[in-house]
């Protein structure tokens, strides 16, 4: 594409398109997980390879800027270009939710942490974040379980899904 803008020409890295690829591979991972398909491990591997090529996993020299800044392109001649909230940010948010095992289907939040890097779970303590204003805590466990808190009472979710209305907190134990 040598006729495109300077920062979109030959030799550039188009970060937004890589993020779109990451989202597409993630969708295939979840389809394979839903079907218990034998291709799941290979798709998980491909997902991690694409993820390793993006943003915070890159060096400043490779990215051309601070790796967590939202840029659209890194030109072949160096330096990130077109700063700002590009479409890449949207894909990165969606894929991160997926990496945390969160999917919304038919009005239910489904928990399926098939892409969660277990190294993110502290040996002592929890991986904590908020999603839709609800605090989540993930801990290492021997069996993957999910619990939600409503009206001060914890409820087990054996199907690993829940209706989000009225949920005050979520906890999960995640098996290796």
What do these predicted regions represent?
Residues 1-176:
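Acidic, mature catalytic/reactive cores of soluble proteins
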